[in-house]
């Protein structure tokens, strides 16, 4: 299990270092020191996303930040983030965030950016349950009260 988490962490580090390049499963499997099939399987198991979806969401989130903060053209951002074409980038952006990149750059609406959860190398320790106490909760209904608020004293 520790070996799997370490491999997923190495893949996440590789992705973050090479996010503006084209990343394939062969490069990720080399970083993980596993076969491409097994690297994809453990990545999906620990992150809940396939490597392709993880990379696409990370690229789109970084491009959304660049559109919001910098005055770059959509074409430049699409090329720098490694999308094959501007049309493909615009379709992926709309599918991910629900708006066009041009509309977003002109008036940024709040969007859910993808923030990856990094796999930590620490292992959870099992807690000793011998020193625990049970807590009983009881709902008590009280009558409504009137409140008088005095302002401007």
Regions picked out by a protein language model, each given a short descriptive name:
Residues 1-6, 53:
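Basic, helix-initiating cap at the start of DNA-binding domains
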Residues 9-26, 44-81, 107-126:
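Terminal helix-turn-helix DNA-binding modules in bacterial transcription factors
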Residues 27-40:
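Helix-turn-helix
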Residues 34, 83-84:
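The short coil/loop that forms the "turn" connecting the two helices of the helix-turn-helix
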Residues 37-39, 43, 88-89, 93:
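Short hydrophobic/aromatic patch on the recognition helix
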Residues 61, 65-68, 73, 84-153:
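A solvent-exposed interaction/effector surface
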């Amino acid at each position: 299990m520790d070996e799997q988490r370490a491999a997923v962490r190495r893949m996440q580090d590789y992705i973050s270092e090479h996010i503006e390049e084209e990343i394939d499963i062969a490069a990720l499997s080399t970083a993980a020191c596993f076969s491409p099939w097994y690297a994809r399987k453990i990545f999906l198991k620990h992150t809940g996303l396939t490597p392709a979806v993880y990379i696409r969401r990370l690229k789109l989130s970084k491009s959304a930040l660049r559109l919001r903060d910098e005055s770059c053209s959509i074409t430049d951002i699409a090329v720098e983030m490694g999308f094959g074409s501007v049309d493909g980038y615009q379709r992926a952006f709309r599918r991910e965030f629900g708006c066009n990149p041009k509309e977003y750059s002109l008036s940024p609406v709040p969007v859910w950016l993808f923030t990856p959860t990094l796999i930590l190398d620490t292992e959870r320790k099992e807690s000793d349950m011998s020193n625990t106490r049970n807590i009983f909760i009881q709902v008590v209904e009280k009558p409504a009260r009137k409140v008088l608020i005095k302002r401007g004293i």
